[in-house]
Amino acid sequence: SSGSHVEYGHDFDMMGDTYTYSYDQSHFNSAHKNALNWMPWDQIQTVNGNYSGRIYAMDQTLVPGRRYALRVAVNTTLDGKSGLDYWVEHRSRFPTNAYLSDGALIYTSDQAPDKNCTDESLKLLDMNPSTPSVSDAGLKAGQSFTDRSNRWKIQVTDQGGSGANSWID
């Protein structure tokens, strides 16, 4: 279904709502961290087929050998912009928000090894669009997001740990 784009509408990103949350809570999203070389490709799992695995909270200090984001290479189109992939990330610095602490944020981006991530391409997907806020945009454990046109399904099956050891499967 269609929705609307809100400029600077990613409440949990540094370029979003920095007035409500403290600076230690807000982090750039994983695609932008990657574009800035703050999150290297070896900490991002890129998939274009079936995959089941774990990602850790990307708003903590990165530990070598862990994955902090999932890039689903689907080359989808949204709002007339093509060549977009889905990005999935988990955040732990919002412990009172179960949509983040127990789930995943999903967005589209054109970030790829040969591209720069631009504002026009980054879209946070609200998994609960019936509410007026994106504070519940996350996909909680047990929920799934399906892209029927690209035949993709993203599902959070479990969550565990806390702080720097917080993860989702």
Report each predicted region and the residues it spans.
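Extracellular hydrolytic enzyme modules, especially secreted metalloproteases
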Residues: 1-97
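Extracellular low-complexity, Gly/Ser/Thr-rich intrinsically disordered linkers
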Residues: 54-169
